[in-house]
Amino acid sequence: MIDIAKEHKVNEQIRVRQIRLIGAEGEQIGIIDTRDALAMAREKGLDLVMVSPQAVPPVCRLLDYGRFRYEQQQNEKENRKRARAQEVKAIKFRVKIDDHDFNTKTGHVRRFLEEGHKVKVTIMFRGRERTHPELGERILHRVAETLADIGAPEGMPSMMGMDMNMIMVPKAAPKRDSGRSESAQEAPTARSAEASRPEAPANA
């Protein structure tokens, strides 16, 4: 595979006399003069790209270098996007938190979950609060209940030093409700039953 992270010598930038050439479909063409390889590339409307300069002789390949770079850059962009989506975000709560702060922080957690992130929810204990872990568990339970429509805890809460942590993970998108389609299927049945009902005889 060609490494897009580094610059490659392309076409006339290749100054060696002979190369080992690989075709556009990955086939081995063999060792040929560079000028012949350049002529072959021009004939096919492709570029001659040096992919292994340390080999003896250097290895080159026929390809559309502009298109190749574009596709690789798009792939790298998509990979970075997926990596960001898998990033674990962190939101911290105090044991003594008022409703306003709680709602604000759970709103941040919700936004991260909607974006596809995992979220580490941390309860920070201070002083003697550490002797009452049930207070932290109560807040984490409240967080999980508040966000149950979009996320769920991954495992049980765990203590680390003066902090209690819980990981929230996004729920899968719900499947589309089939109720509408079922009712749509029932309607023709009702109409067909109505249509098949015998008409009352006309009054004489």
UniProtKB/Swiss-Prot annotation:
GO cellular component, one term: cytosol
This protein's encoding gene: infC
InterPro entries membership: T_IF-3_C_sf, T_IF-3_N_sf, Translation_initiation_fac3_CS, Translation_initiation_fac_3, Translation_initiation_fac_3_C, Translation_initiation_fac_3_N
Protein name: Translation initiation factor IF-3
Cell location: Cytoplasm
Swiss-Prot/TrEMBL keywords: Cytoplasm, Initiation factor, Protein biosynthesis
Predominant localisation class: cytoplasm
Record function comment: IF-3 binds to the 30S ribosomal subunit and shifts the equilibrium between 70S ribosomes and their 50S and 30S subunits in favor of the free subunits, thus enhancing the availability of 30S subunits on which protein synthesis initiation begins.
Natural source organism: Deinococcus geothermalis (strain DSM 11300 / CIP 105573 / AG-3a)
Region described as Disordered: spans on this chain: 169-204
Subunit structure, interactors included: Monomer.
